[in-house]
Amino acid sequence: MIVIYHNSKRVTRVVSDTLEVIDFDSSNSIASVLMHIALQFPNKSIAWCHQDYEGFVNWNEFPKVLHHNKIMVSFSPSIQIYLGREIGYVEESPFINVNKRVSYPTWQMSSGIGGMQASVLVQFKGKIKECRNFDYFLNSMAKLGMPLGLCCYSEPKLFKIFPECPQPKATIFTLFQFVYQHYKTRWLFLMLFNLMVYEKRLPIFAFLKALLYKKRSNIGISLDSIVVQSSKEVVNEATVDVIIPTIGRKSYLYDVLKDLALQTHLPKQVIIVEQNPMKGSESELDYLKNENWPFKIKHTFTHQAGACNARNLALAQVESEWVFMADDDVRIEAQFIQKGLSFAKMYATKAVTFGCYQANYAEGKKIKHTMQWNSFGSGCSIVRLKENNELRYNTSLEFGYGEDTEFGLQLRNEGIDVVFTPYPEILHLKAPIGGFRTKPVLQWHKEVIQPKPSPTIMY
């Protein structure tokens, strides 16, 4: 590993992990020196560190957190973020409000301490300007790289003890520049509008100056040539439970079970929660007992409808290391579970969401890159919950909106990143029968004044 020490304005020294001093051009920007060192040592990991942080850094953790080639990490002990809370007017993804207690996915990087592989750095050579503002350079690189498969994290393990040092803060001019260069132009106007309405500020000169910069959205960066194989282990027992909430889809669920029975890596047990809100109704899933299955089936029948409740009932019965959260109207290939676990091993991720599309979904609209996901798929994901088996869906969102996203937030706040992979793909049949097709009467539906947006949206 090569470490680049700096004082926020320029590089002060560069040393290797064997304490060899490496020459550099002190007149260049920190970003330029970083890129030059990456070109000089393309097979090394590169770290940057503010000189005031040197005594607080946990260098032993770097090989552990940089466990595969497409990882970029940094950490700032400060509550303040470089781009400020105003960036929340532009982006509402989970990557903005960072949990500093755990390893957390975010493109918001810090110049204080961080690192990545030189092989990734060189892919940005000539693509983005190696400017004097090192924090801007790092944030730009992470923001552009994340949708292309670069896994970016705030990692508190980089410090032994958190130092009390201020986080550099972007000016309002820099903030507007960042928004214009990395988002659609309409967000620049919306941020100006929000600052006017909610903060009584009118930074018109920052707004106008931002329009002079060049966009960075289509600059031809590709990370596909970089091989990923994590040195970290997340698959030990390789046991899998499948949970399936179902309502009124007997034939579709049967096909799902048949697909599971043909798996090259069989699940240990399949947990089915069958719902029928009609009083006096009984289970219609006779084939659960009438046929032989190569896995244990746990069947729960309930009159209480609701996907959140059903999934929670299923999660309480999980015994395996991994959980495949499935739907009752999907189809999967015979090697689905095997390939899913192989991907989890490759990236050492504890939560994987798979591409899940209908048969007529346009091929050109499908996501083709592996990347950190800003949501979560409750019917198309595998998750390692062995250490976090207390996690449950929030029933406040029952029959509403966003329970998938909220469960994903719970995972991230436990230090579990959600990674999307396009393969193996799940076919979603979107069954025309069953499911939750009766519109529920929620608490606020009979109110004279209807809340807009609805409480579940505002939640």
PLM feature segments, named:
Residues 79-82, 92-116, 366-383, 442-448:
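A recurrent flexible, glycine/aromatic-enriched loop bordering the glycosyltransferase active site
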Residues 140, 238-243, 269, 406:
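Cell-envelope/extracellular polymer assembly enzymes that use nucleotide-activated donors
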